[in-house]
Amino acid sequence: MFIFLLFLTLTSGSDLDRCTTFDDVQAPNYTQHTSSMRGVYYPDEIFRSDTLYLTQDLFLPFYSNVTGFHTINHTFGNPVIPFKDGIYFAATEKSNVVRGWVFGSTMNNKSQSVIIINNSTNVVIRACNFELCDNPFFAVSKPMGTQTHTMIFDNAFNCTFEYISDAFSLDVSEKSGNFKHLREFVFKNKDGFLYVYKGYQPIDVVRDLPSGFNTLKPIFKLPLGINITNFRAILTAFSPAQDIWGTSAAAYFVGYLKPTTFMLKYDENGTITDAVDCSQNPLAELKCSVKSFEIDKGIYQTSNFRVVPSGDVVRFPNITNLCPFGEVFNATKFPSVYAWERKKISNCVADYSVLYNSTFFSTFKCYGVSATKLNDLCFSNVYADSFVVKGDDVRQIAPGQTGVIADYNYKLPDDFMGCVLAWNTRNIDATSTGNYNYKYRYLRHGKLRPFERDISNVPFSPDGKPCTPPALNCYWPLNDYGFYTTTGIGYQPYRVVVLSFELLNAPATVCGPKLSTDLIKNQCVNFNFNGLTGTGVLTPSSKRFQPFQQFGRDVSDFTDSVRDPKTSEILDISPCSFGGVSVITPGTNASSEVAVLYQDVNCTDVSTAIHADQLTPAWRIYSTGNNVFQTQAGCLIGAEHVDTSYECDIPIGAGICASYHTVSLLRSTSQKSIVAYTMSLGADSSIAYSNNTIAIPTNFSISITTEVMPVSMAKTSVDCNMYICGDSTECANLLLQYGSFCTQLNRALSGIAAEQDRNTREVFAQVKQMYKTPTLKYFGGFNFSQILPDPLKPTKRSFIEDLLFNKVTLADAGFMKQYGECLGDINARDLICAQKFNGLTVLPPLLTDDMIAAYTAALVSGTATAGWTFGAGAALQIPFAMQMAYRFNGIGVTQNVLYENQKQIANQFNKAISQIQESLTTTSTALGKLQDVVNQNAQALNTLVKQLSSNFGAISSVLNDILSRLDKVEAEVQIDRLITGRLQSLQTYVTQQLIRAAEIRASANLAATKMSECVLGQSKRVDFCGKGYHLMSFPQAAPHGVVFLHVTYVPSQERNFTTAPAICHEGKAYFPREGVFVFNGTSWFITQRNFFSPQIITTDNTFVSGNCDVVIGIINNTVYDPLQPELDSFKEELDKYFKNHTSPDVDLGDISGINASVVNIQKEIDRLNEVAKNLNESLIDLQELGKYEQYIKWPWYVWLGFIAGLIAIVMVTILLCCMTSCCSCLKGACSCGSCCKFDEDDSEPVLKGVKLHYT
């Protein structure tokens, strides 16, 4: 199969040949393919290393459709293709078939086109008016493998650009086999430049566009400045013989660029290694929102939908009369400057461009408005003031000027809005002999006010007294100009017209010649009503304006309504639709699946409420599917709604949770997906008396937890001027117009720094000096040496004494200290040192070992000798009995003191509680009075706050008015943008610091609480002081914080028990006094909640309350909407720079409605002072219990004497046995029952009813 060519002329390959036409050419088959991640290019020439970069430009969207064009045999696919915003062009080749392109609009000689071709020896680029061939192509002879013809255009003229590369040699022979080369190009025509990017990748494919990622690099930036709407490829035709032609196999693919945001990933070498199309899907947008390729599990707020206006609405009044400016400028005679005249211009169309473009005026200066924008504006009225001055005085006709003319003749206000036009009239108002008809005032008592006119001609005297010239110090106030045609230009006459514009405080009567458009309602549009410009949705309003009212403002002073100047219809202005979107993800490490929450939108309205047709393509996500779940928070798409409840992995809000689970729990598959469900505390049947299962610890282990809590952060300040402007003087001067913003920022930072110091003081002020910790200087990477005590200091006694003595400390009721001083180290003086206390003889309840030995020896001796001393030996038992009695007395009086102290504590505590309650009542009364006053002013204060906060909106209106009227110097515009952007950055930084400071403040408060509850006490809260049940805690200072070392015991083993909050028995409910009821499978027990210690349920550990009826109530079912922040008032700050602008009409309203009542709570304060006094009197005066310390250990001679005494007693006992009748009982020879029998004591114990348990 071949292609036949008609009228073919063979010439050398180096020449452009005459066009020819193909016969029997078949239309190519167009196929659709996916672009995968093709088409990414370097957006600029800036080196970036190891960073993520967001850029918005024309890109080929990822996984978009590209159209494939194929050439083989007589299928020659190079049609004219639309260019649109730009194209992605990829060619899969093996024989260099694609050789170039033609870009243009009409693609003929009626307009310029640009040709980019590879002619096998050079790359040639030309921009001309071409007579293009119908089928532009290169011809190659198959047998020779050489190029023979170049048939691209017949003629070229009006060439404005040409480029020829260095010479090279291209292999143009036909190849067989698979496609080996993938050449990618991106073309975009922007700002008069044609940008060309190129990439190459070796391939081995049979068909289709291979998937993959390859970054294209810039090769051309062509300054062509031509309109490009179409293009076509230039291919190669292969000729097996003369006059017979065919094509080789090749394919190219075309995709269209769109304005899209891409996130590019640069490696350390500045190479783009990965990219994200932010508009591809919700996950891609989420990655761009958080600027990360890896997303953790959670729900994330992404960008709002940004609606693009669908059109422009321009509405001006129905005025057709032209303004009579000619009557003003072409008047035959002008008045003198002191008697200037004014003409009111209204109800007409003003074409200011005629004045602006005229070369007739030597001076044309506008103030407060740009001359080039006058035709776009409307005014209530325009006033034209006219007069004549000399050339040198024209400069005084301006705001803020001084001089004879400005002070005594014609004065403009400082906030003047209008234009000054002046032109030389020497040919009209000057003569060769002098024209003295024009006068000016040169003397006056006091300066004129703006637009004040004084036409009097009363003689002037410095003292103000009447006089008649030519008397001394008496002058006529007017002087003649005397215009001569021969004088210099500074003394020549100039006619002046001052146009003053009255802003729209009334219906517009003077407008520019701008044509009105149709009114578009219920769509996002750019509007211009009498010069009021903005963007919003226009809807019919129910408001009723007064005839003179043109605009309406809300409570925040934002323009929210307008009168249509053509129809007088009242229209409401609302912002274009913005819909909040959240993305739920299980984390990119788990899955790329996401769900999308369209906030506050019904699922039935998702496609319309967000105005998908008006969304900008640069940043857009929209998801639909079968898994649609309507929630109170909005429409959730992409998550499967299930009734089963899981652990709440991702809280969405409004009672909805999401998790990533295996769906096999619901169906017989192993696929995982995002499931959404309604959070629940249990089924409806799970009422108070239902059985539930709890885990109770049965064994524990000691755990040490380190907890770091920040209480401060690094102090920062900002060199605002250097940060924003660097060394630029111009920027610094412009920054002055922003007032004290920088000072306020640093003031906020200083406040944060002071708060950090306060946090630190408050936390560490609770660390007591008496607190001791073990010698542990380093633990867990933290240094504990700052709070650890020094090594133990030596005690009062020496080491040897501590070795020989034991120390015992007792509570002293008041007699033990005297006893110790009396006793000294002589234990034998025990009874002698007995003390008197409240009429009783007392001894300390303390017996040392040597005292016990002495009294025991006396007792045994008295008992043993009683038989043979006829009872006299029993007297030795008296010391034992006396000291026992005295010691019981000592114990008794000590217990009595303790009891009395406890009684005093209870009484005084109860008294203090009553005083505290009374103080709380008094405080509540005082606060009630305060609340009443505050409530009375609430509405007025709310109104005032809204009016004050609305100033920022009014400022925006002022700026919009100024921007719509003024032309700025480009340099100042750029500097102002820089300042605004960096000020916003600084404000964001300070806001972040304030948020962080709030977090630090909360952390410091929590640290102070833990210092009190964990360090200075033992917390009963589980997991509050470490993990588990708290034992003790140690604090340690750390950088910007405090470290707690919590010692806890944590459950190591647990058992599950069935439990119930109460047990119903015989119609009554029994509740545990402490602990919980558990069921072990056979019986119910009561046990502690934190440790399994079952006890039998008795009336001692339960109490009865109420009946078995269950009352179920909802404590709180309130869902709070997010608060809308009020804008801060910058009125005082900006009044310095924006004064007397009438268009925004900033009005703080009538604040006289505030009730300025004085709160009188003096009685309550006096009562609080009295209560405080009573509380001070509640100090508990306890009887002092001193501490008595005694070191006890028998010395060696006591032991020796004790042993000797025992030996003597034994010997005496043996002697007695030998001397009495009991001697023979030892051998059993006689009865000695009365001597050797042991009596059995069957008496009851003294303490009856007391059972002793030994464990």
Curated annotation (Swiss-Prot):
Effect noted on mutating E452A: 90% loss of human ACE2 binding in vitro
Post-translational modification: The cytoplasmic Cys-rich domain is palmitoylated. Spike glycoprotein is digested by cathepsin CTSL within endosomes.
Reported impact of R797N: Complete loss of trypsin-induced membrane fusion
Alphabetical list of SUPFAM superfamilies matching this protein: Coronavirus S2 glycoprotein, SARS receptor-binding domain-like
Effect seen on changing D613E: In strain: Isolate GD03
Record topological domains on the Cytoplasmic side: 1217-1255
Keyword tags: Coiled coil, Disulfide bond, Fusion of virus membrane with host endosomal membrane, Fusion of virus membrane with host membrane, Glycoprotein, Host cell membrane, Host membrane, Host-virus interaction, Inhibition of host innate immune response by virus, Inhibition of host tetherin by virus, Lipoprotein, Membrane, Palmitate, Signal, Transmembrane, Transmembrane helix, Viral attachment to host cell, Viral envelope protein, Viral immunoevasion, Viral penetration into host cytoplasm, Virion, Virulence, Virus entry into host cell
Effect of S607P: In strain: Isolate SZ3
Main localization category: virion
Membrane topology according to the record: Single-pass type I membrane protein
Phenotype upon changing N479K: In strain: Isolate SZ3; 20fold decrease of affinity with human ACE2; no effect on affinity with palm civet ACE2
Known outcome of mutating D463A: Partial loss of human ACE2 binding in vitro
One Pfam family from the record: CoV_S2
Signal peptide positions on this chain: 1-13
Record-annotated disulphide pairs: C19-C133, C128-C159, C278-C288, C323-C348, C366-C419, C378-C511, C467-C474, C822-C833
Protein location: Virion membrane; Host endoplasmic reticulum-Golgi intermediate compartment membrane; Host cell membrane
Residue span, BetaCoV S1-NTD domain: 14-290
Sequence similarity: Belongs to the betacoronaviruses spike protein family.
Note: Tor2 is the prototype of the virus isolated during the severe SARS outbreak in 2002-2003. GD03 has been isolated from the second mild SARS outbreak in winter 2003-2004. SZ3 has been isolated from palm civet, the presumed animal reservoir. The spike proteins from those three isolates display a strong affinity for palm civet ACE2 receptor, whereas only the Tor2 spike protein efficiently binds human ACE2. This may explain the high pathogenicity of Tor2 virus, whose spike is highly adapted to the human host.
Protein name (record): Spike glycoprotein
Native source species: Severe acute respiratory syndrome coronavirus
Gene: S
